[in-house]
From Swiss-Prot:
GO process annotations (BP): intracellular potassium ion homeostasis; micturition; negative regulation of cell volume; positive regulation of apoptotic process; potassium ion transmembrane transport; potassium ion transport; regulation of membrane potential; response to calcium ion
Variant or mutagenesis effect after changing residue 119 to A: Decreased localization to the plasma membrane. Abolishes localization to the plasma membrane
Biased composition (Basic and acidic residues): 1220-1236
Annotated Gene Ontology cellular component terms: apical plasma membrane; caveola; membrane; plasma membrane; postsynaptic membrane; voltage-gated potassium channel complex
Organism from which the protein derives: Homo sapiens
Protein name: Calcium-activated potassium channel subunit alpha-1
Length: 1236
């Protein structure tokens, strides 16, 4: 045996030596791919089998030729010396495993079926015997089963528990199962990678398991696969179907050959490519890891995994057969192809290109290609287009926002269009703001069009867009809403259904607040009544910065203020809009208008140098020295509540850390109020030099601040001032311990400052700056802040109005109120309206029908019925329009006095003449049908036609004079019988209007470009921005688009919105909104000291310079002198001019149109025809002499043309002598009787 073995080895060795070069052949024929002839093949088979079973000599078989060796042989690897193929052994291991197991399963099922049938028959016989033998107990229960049955039940239970345990182990519902599934998939991919590495070696080769690292890793992987296969087998309910699964087949043809490789010390590449089929489970794995969440992504990964796994598997089969050859051809027709060349071949085959550079030579390969083309072509034609479609339809903006450290971001959603986004960005990123270190993230469910995408790219450093919906929590997480500084929701101002748009925005608020209750939300609302729904959201808190910008409320509020002071809507709109300064050299009206347009509203904390000074003093100092206009402050009351006080008067002293509201052209200019230091900047004349100084400002105690303020009031030095006695100081110490920042007790420290003030000129000396203009209080100011109780003021008409049985104001005391009236009682016919002889009233032309959306006329009427007007000062309001529409609005209007309705149409000149439109103080043109038209250029057709219709009307001058004289009404505070003794001066008496062009009109527009059709004498270009057009500058046109700037202004300073709403709504508060949300109407209330105190708040008015106490300044005087005089004498705060358009021209016949000049400089020259915008204090005594006259007539009109819109100022002497003489009262009574 030894010799034989040696001889065999020797011949083999000799063959190896002689054929050494043949083992490493050329690239055409691989050494292990040489084929044998038929006889040598059979000899090789018998020789290989005999050598593998024993070491006997091979004398009985023919030795193969040297060129017939197949497997490379080395001395280190114990392998078959003859180099014969053993592929059949590897394949046989897989086939035996598969078919053997299948046979066992089928045999088991057959035996189980037979056993079940037999036992079923036997069980029926046994059960029948038990019933016949009476085996049941007396109580009807069966006897206990025998011990054998208990053992069977226990055995079944044990098997079931093992099966359940195995199911839990492989289930993806548990953490262990998910980890195991992911691990199996990862190891399968690892085994596939090992296959890719081994594919560069021959198909079959000798390998030493102990030295081959890849074989060892592959062996470890397959041991794990075997264990996992066992778990799956145990957990499977149907073993047969489990055996035929794709994953099971993969294990059959990949796991057993590895063990054969270890036994035979040789490797066969074989069917290991089947591991690529595991890629089909890739989408499931990603779902387990919570990576794939959308249906499109799951579908895309499924298609890709199926396509790639099929492709790689087919390439592996072609690689096997082409490198091996056909068995019936003795493996002689093989060709050397790498695996990746086979991958390439399969791709060009599936795509039907077939370049021919690589093709199959073996019969098995070509046969496989025939069938693969049928399936592969179908798969390629269906899968590839679908994959491309899914990839193409993927959201371009579907990523997630990555927050930048140290940089805030806001989320903007809602109505995202090119117009809304461009308007928002233009104002938000304006250069006049300080460096805006805020990133804007837009979230919308529709991808942007090309224009909007280009806009985003232009602002790519500060703007990002993501496609999604705020109603989806996943999308909210993508934009990091929880870390956002605020969320802004834009509304579609031009939608056909405003209520539906508001409902959408409310749902957005609910979704955002539900995801993150602490996020600050600023949303636009179209309808005022829909704001009440926001109060139902538990996490909605306006005190924490949540704000709802109601466009209808503000739009109609602006228009209402224009009825009181024409042009105010333009001025206020320009103040909170960021406009760049446009310099014009020519001396035209546009030059002065644009200088005012560059002003905006800013806030800044006041310097400690202002602490203890009164508001008028600080206001004058800021205007004269700092070139700043301060109109309001944020005041902290004794109970630490913050309130915004507009021109509060000189009874209020500035506290430490007071926030001021300024009108300025740049945010840097407002810093002067914070940097101002009396010690360092008192002698500086150039405000630009006022910068932060280096001196340390000691914090004064409350006693020192009060003593300083006291000395300012009395005009003495602190050493000589005796106002602050020791007892007062002791009381102040107690007060300081209770309220460290409160300084209200300083209100009573001075009594003789009035005389001193009148004797001294206006300078910047602290002793001479302090002005005293009477006791005034803001609507939100606590009564504790008033110097005197308003009920104790001599001559106060509120004493007479304190009737506990009469309700004249609403429950908050902010608005005039009357008992609800039926609409029939206020309807006027055309003849009744003509006989009423209306004058000084407001005509509201409204277009609408029964199907039109409500515009909320209550928001127009409420500012005109504010309680800081006396009853006789209220302008009568006449609505001209469809009675069907007005009936729908009447529910919110029936509690307001002096309201009438003329059914008709604003296009009817007869209706307009019946309401004396030529004698009105203002004509308002509104339309509720604007959003029902698709063509934007036609949305304003009704308003434009009505405006042109009124302007083309002609009126008889004699008729107007007769009507004015027959009316017999006197303006507020003026007695016609004794004009010399009248306390009113400065009344602007204008001639009667003979043409409609001179009628004051304000027209609401939807489309900004339609403003070009209102004035025929202007030269505005159609592309001119709205604020640059003549109708807007003159205050005769208003568009809701100007309110877009409020979103940015509110974000940067939430107090701005409160200030604007206080100015334009007449005093609407969150408490009032909550009350209206409950009843949808104002509730009447009895007069109390608290509600009557709310009347004491300032209001916007226009001051005439043609006559009165300021007439001397009207002819060439300086605006700054007027500002200081009005402030110190009447506590009136001037902030703009309403000037004739051609005032700068020396033409005899000037145009009657006026334009707005905002915050002119100190040295600005005045002309006599100017009207001054001012914040006027409430006068308690102005309505005393008119109270009985005004309330005795329900429909009387108490102001002549322009008398109530152009206010006059009581003189100082007459303020001290309020009670009218008996002669004056008798003359008033005579006028009243004559009128009746």
């Amino acid at each position: 045996m030894a010799n034989g073995g040696g001889g065999g080895g020797g011949s083999s060795g000799g063959g190896g030596g002689g054929g050494g070069s043949s083992l490493r052949m050329s690239s055409n024929i691989h050494a292990n791919h040489l084929s044998l002839d038929a006889s040598s093949s059979s000899s090789s088979s018998s020789s290989s089998s005999s050598s593998s079973s024993s070491s006997s000599s091979s004398s009985s078989v023919h030795e193969p030729k040297m060129d017939a060796l197949i497997i490379p042989v080395t001395m280190e690897v114990p392998c078959d010396s003859r180099g014969q193929r053993m592929w059949w052994a590897f394949l046989a291991s897989s086939m035996v495993t598969f078919f053997g197991g299948l046979f066992i399963i089928l045999l088991w099922r057959t035996l189980k079926y037979l056993w079940t049938v037999c036992c079923h028959c036997g069980g029926k016989t046994k059960e029948a015997q038990k019933i016949n033998n009476g085996s049941s107990q007396a109580d009807g229960t069966l006897k206990p089963v025998d011990e054998k049955e208990e053992a069977v039940a226990a055995e079944v239970g044990w098997m079931t528990s093992v099966k359940d345990w195995a199911g839990v182990m492989i289930s993806a519902q548990t953490l262990t199962g998910r980890v195991l599934v992911v691990l199996v998939f990862a190891l399968s991919i690892g085994a596939l990678v090992i296959y890719f590495i081994d594919s560069s070696n021959p198909i079959e080769s000798c390998q030493n398991f102990y030295k081959d690292f890849t074989l060892q890793i592959d062996m470890a992987f397959n041991v794990f696969f075997l264990l996992y296969f066992g778990l799956r087998f145990i957990a499977a309910n149907d073993k047969l179907w489990f055996w035929l699964e794709v994953n099971s087949v993969v294990d059959f043809f990949t796991v057993p050959p590895v063990f054969v490789s270890v036994y035979l010390n040789r490797s066969w590449l074989g069917l290991r490519f089947l591991r690529a089929l595991r890629l089909i489970q890739f989408s499931e794995i990603l779902q387990f890891l919570n990576i794939l969440k959308t249906s499109n992504s799951i579908k895309l990964v499924n298609l890709l995994s199926i396509f790639i796994s099929t492709w790689l598997t087919a390439a592996g089969f072609i690689h096997l057969v082409e490198n091996s050859g056909d068995p019936w051809e003795n493996f002689q027709n093989n060709q050397a192809l790498t695996y990746w060349e086979c991958v390439y071949l399969l791709m060009v085959t599936m795509s039907t290109v077939g370049y021919g550079d690589v093709y199959a030579k073996t019969t098995l390969g070509r046969l496989f290609m025939v069938f693969f083309i049928l399936g592969g072509l179908a798969m390629f034609a269906s899968y590839v287009p679908e994959i491309i479609e899914l990839i193409g339809n993927r959201k371009k903006y579907g990523g997630s926002y990555s927050a930048v450290s140290g940089r805030k971001h806001i989320v903007v959603c809602g109505h995202i269009t090119l117009e809304s986004v461009s308007n928002f960005l233009k104002d938000f990123l304006h250069k006049d703001r300080d460096d805006v270190n805020v990133e804007i993230v837009f979230l919308h469910n529709i991808s942007p069009n090309l224009e909007l995408e280009a806009l985003f790219k232009r602002h790519f450093t500060q703007v990002e867009f993501y496609q999604g919906s705020v109603l989806n929590p996943h999308d909210l997480a993508r934009v990091k809403i929880e870390s956002a500084d605020a969320c802004l929701i834009l509304a579609n101002k031009y939608c056909a259904d405003p209520d539906a748009e508001d409902a959408s925005n409310i749902m957005r608020v609910i979704s955002i607040k539900n995801y993150h209750p602490k996020i600050r939300i600023i949303t636009q609302m179209l309808q005022y009544h829909n704001k009440a729904h926001l109060l139902n959201i538990p996490s909605w808190n306006w005190k924490e910065g949540d704000d709802a910008i109601c466009l209808a409320e503000l739009k109609l509020g602006f228009i209402a203020q224009s009825c009181l002071a024409q042009g105010l809507s333009t001025m206020l709109a320009n103040l909170f809009s960021m406009r760049s300064f446009i310099k014009i050299e020519e001396d035209t009206w546009q030059k002065y208008y644009l200088e005012g347009v560059s002003n905006e509203m800013y806030t800044e904390y006041l310097s400690s140098a202002f602490v203890g000074l009164s508001f008028p003093t600080v206001c004058e100092l800021c205007f004269v020295k700092l070139k700043l206009l301060m109109i309001a402050i944020e005041y902290k009351s004794a109970n630490r509540e913050s309130r915004i006080l507009i021109n509060p008067g000189n009874h209020l002293k500035i506290q430490e850390g007071t926030l001021g509201f300024f009108i300025a052209s740049d945010a840097k200019e407002v810093k002067r109020a914070f940097f101002y230091c009396k010690a360092c900047h008192d002698d500086i004349t150039d405000p630009k030099r006022i910068k932060k100084c280096g001196c340390k400002r000691p914090k004064m105690s409350i006693y020192k601040r009060m003593r300083r303020a006291c000395c300012f009031d009395c005009g003495r030095s602190e050493r000589d001032c005796s106002c602050m006695s020791g007892r007062v100081r002791g009381n102040v110490d107690t007060l300081e311990r209770a309220f460290p920042l409160s300084s209200v007790s300083v209100n009573d420290c001075s009594t003789s400052f009035r005389a001193f003030e009148d004797e001294q000129p206006s300078t910047l000396s602290p002793k001479k700056k302090q002005r005293n203009g009477g006791m005034r209080n803001s609507p939100n100011t606590s009564p504790k802040l008033m110097r005197h109780d308003p009920l104790l003021i001599p001559g106060n008409d509120q004493i007479d109005n304190m009737d506990s049985n009469v309700k004249k104001y609403d429950s908050t005391g902010m608005f005039h109120w009357c008992a609800p009236k039926e609409i029939e009682k206020v309807i006027l016919t055309r003849s009744e309206a003509a006989m009423t002889v209306l004058s000084g009233h407001v005509v509201v032309c409204i277009f609408g029908d029964v199907s039109s959306a409500l515009i909320g006329l209550r928001n127009l009427v409420m500012p005109l019925r504010a309680s800081n007007f006396h009853y006789h000062e209220l302008k009568h309001i006449v609505f001209v329009g469809s009675i069907e529409y007005l009936k729908r609005e009447w529910e919110t209007l029936h509690n307001f006095p002096k309201v009438s309705i003329l059914p008709g149409t604003p296009l009817s000149r007869a209706d307009l003449r019946a309401v004396n439109i030529n004698l009105c103080d203002m004509c308002v043109i509104l339309s509720a049908n604007q959003n029902n038209i698709d063509d934007t250029s036609l949305q304003d057709k009704e308003c434009i036609l009505a405006s042109l219709n009124i302007k083309s009307m002609q009126f008889d001058d004699s008729i107007g004079v007769l009507q004015a004289n027959s009316q017999g009404f006197t303006p507020p505070g003026m007695d016609r019988s004794s004009p010399d003794n009248s306390p009113v001066h400065g009344m602007l008496r204008q001639p009667s209007i003979t043409t409609g062009v001179n009628i004051p009109i304000i027209t609401e527009l939807v489309n900004d470009t339609n403003v070009q059709f209102l004035d025929q004498d202007d030269d505005d270009d159609p592309d001119t921005e709205l604020y640059l057009t003549q109708p807007f500058a003159c205050g005769t046109a208003f568009a809701v688009s100007v309110l877009d700037s409020l979103m940015s202004a509110t974000y940067f300073n939430d107090n701005i919105l409160t200030l604007i709403r206080t100015l334009v709504t007449g005093g609407a508060t969150p408490e009032l909104e909550a009350l209206i949300a409950e009843e949808n109407a104002l509730r009447g209330g009895y007069s109390t000291p608290q509600t009557l105190a709310n009347r004491d708040r300032c209001r916007v008015a226009q001051l005439a310079l043609l006559d009165g106490p300021f007439a001397d300044l009207g002819d060439g005087g300086c605006y700054g002198d007027l500002f200081c005089k009005a402030l110190k004498t009447y506590n009136m705060l001037c902030f703009g001019i309403y000037r004739l358009r051609d005032a700068h021209l020396s033409t005899p016949s000037q145009c009657t149109k006026r334009y707005v000049i905002t915050n002119p400089p100190y040295e600005f020259e005045l002309v006599p025809t100017d009207l001054i915008f001012c914040l006027m204090q409430f006068d308690h005594n102005a309505g005393q002499s008119r109270a009985s006259l005004s309330h005795s007539s329900h429909s009387s009109q108490s102001s002549s043309k322009k008398s109530s819109s152009v206010h006059s100022i009581p003189s100082t002497a007459n303020r001290q002598n309020r009670p009218k003489s008996r002669e004056s009262r008798d003359k008033q009574k005579y006028v009243q009787e004559e009128r009746l």
